[in-house]
Amino acid sequence: MDGYQYEHHCAKLLKQRGFRDVAVTKSSGDQGIDVIAYNENVKYGIQCKYYSYPVGNQAVQQAYAGAKFYDCNVAVVMTNSTFTEPAKELAQKLGVQLWEKSYIPN
């Protein structure tokens, strides 16, 4: 699976979990958001990272900025992997949700 395929995989998982109006953004110039989805009238901006190593700060920064650009209520980084401690700290400060191992919370 590559990054593009993972974005579509994430979109499929979101639909299965009851998110609606799930859309994958264009691959270039996406402003840091790969998928936009709604759950209970909350707009999520999701950065998808398919990595073989822990995701770092840059993805958190991209999700935060991209969510602002798309007027999302919630910024998320979703990965098949895990996150570095600095990324976790930054996400907590910025209010970015981190979904590890493709886990989508209720």
Model-derived features: positions:
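Mixed-charge (Asp/Glu-Lys/Arg
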Residues: M1-N106
